[in-house]
Amino acid sequence: MIISAASDYRAAAQRILPPFLFHYMDGGAYSEYTLRRNVEDLSEVALRQRILKNMSDLSLETTLFNEKLSMPVALGPVGLCGMYARRGEVQAAKAADAHGIPFTLSTVSVCPIEEVAPAIKRPMWFQLYVLRDRGFMRNALERAKAAGCSTLVFTVDMPTPGARYRDAHSGMSGPNAAMRRYLQAVTHPQWAWDVGLNGRPHDLGNISAYLGKPTGLEDYIGWLGNNFDPSISWKDLEWIRDFWDGPMVIKGILDPEDARDAVRFGADGIVVSNHGGRQLDGVLSSARALPAIADAVKGDIAILADSGIRNGLDVVRMIALGADTILLGRAFLYALATAGQAGVANLLNLIEKEMKVAMTLTGAKSISEITQDSLVQGLGKELPAALAPMAKGNAA
């Protein structure tokens, strides 16, 4: 199979993976409207083509939180990576490290902090949820700090799990889920051999380390689902801000006023994100939400963004809309499921090449030159006319 884009990795991953795993990463909440709009809205953002600009000394390098990045991209937190490739978190982290960009370990990773951190030279980032069990949160933070994690990504848009209907149909949840998953696994031999047999243990490494016993998918659905905390407020984050020494990023911002609150709180960064369309269907796509948020807080706080980004052109679009750096999610997971570390490495090379093409043809020699001026104006403020009413309606 020829791999020329993330979409090729998606098709390959669908063939390799048992349906419960493919649809878990590929699906979204409710009718998946926001999941679709994340991709479609971003694809409609029009860039200005510029010519005869002497682009021979183009550079993608940037700096974030005093870290040098080879390009304004990081691998975002994705749960259960180790179910998609053998010790998947380690493989993805190694690919990111080799490319000179950060890797973010999820709270609900298969590989624990202590397995991933020593496998790479660059300090990794760590993502944490707000859970009722504050003892687990403190334990995870202490272990992340001891492992040398540099940046904390604090996810706040999951006070309760989203309604993901695909999961019930695919076997991730629903009636007879365990038996359905087993039958799917044995009919997908490549995955069964590489991950099912040779990728063990399949427990949730960070949670097992705290509970002192093996965990699995039932704990992911049960213990974790019962521990999300709908009572969370900004005040609950204060002890974390005091405890954590490094940069703290608030993930799950879609409204300018919440972005301003993050600045007032003292966060170092925010992630403009709707959780990849996996939480509340019908909310703004990240591409729609980003311009108003950038208007509100650009320069006061680092702005990261995710959701809907599938290639290097999308990265350039997001930066033009106001992001400083973007996080990859599904795109790298498709590649990981298809070809492990080599797949993620190839995807990052593709994204870098696509960014260079987009920057060359828009006349931006550096990341700092990708601005609102890189967008076609007159179609609506920073967005095509079809998107502008939503963006204006969300301005605060």
From Swiss-Prot:
It is a peripheral membrane protein. The keyword Cell membrane applies. Its main location: membrane. The active site is at 275 (proton acceptor). Its cofactor is FMN. One of its GO terms (biological process) is aerobic respiration. The keyword Cytoplasm does not apply. FMN binds at residues 106, 127, 155, 251, 306-330. SUPFAM superfamilies: FMN-linked oxidoreductases. Residues 1-380 form the FMN hydroxy acid dehydrogenase domain. One of its GO terms (molecular function) is L-lactate dehydrogenase activity. Keywords: Cell inner membrane, Cell membrane, Flavoprotein, FMN, Membrane, Oxidoreductase. Its EC number is 1.1.-.-. It is found in: Cell inner membrane. Substrate binds at residues 24, 129, 164, 278. It is an enzyme of class 1 (oxidoreductase). It catalyses: (S)-lactate + A = pyruvate + AH2. Gene3D superfamilies: Aldolase class I (3.20.20.70). GO terms for cellular component: plasma membrane. Pfam families: FMN_dh. NCBIfam families: L_lactate_LldD, PRK11197.1. Belongs to the FMN-dependent alpha-hydroxy acid dehydrogenase family. Catalyzes the conversion of L-lactate to pyruvate. Is coupled to the respiratory chain. This is L-lactate dehydrogenase.
